[in-house]
Amino acid sequence: MLSTRSDAQELAQYQWKHRVIILCGDSHSDSYQKQLNMLSAEELDAKFADRKLILIKDSKEHCDDVFKIMLYGLDGGMKLSSSTVVKAQEIFDLIDSMPMRRAEIMRRNGKS
């Protein structure tokens, strides 16, 4: 799921419903475009849905950095902040290592 953040949205609206990736900075920078292309690949839609993950694009006016990617967990806490491009699989692996995600997987697999 991809949305555009044109003004300062509250992360609280996503808490306990979605994990959130925020991509912010100069949307014309190489890093921003590379990260956006990596995370917008159609083949990742199922992985995003399975992890309750959404991607929000933020404009430079809300971000002092040329490029920054941030990941927030279901609890609303920041789990990752980077000014360099992060591979999608690294993000998925990080999420999959989180206790809430591991509990989701166990419930889905019928294990308590």
Task: Outline where the language-model segments fall.
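Non-catalytic interaction/Regulatory regions outside core domains
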Residues: 1-112
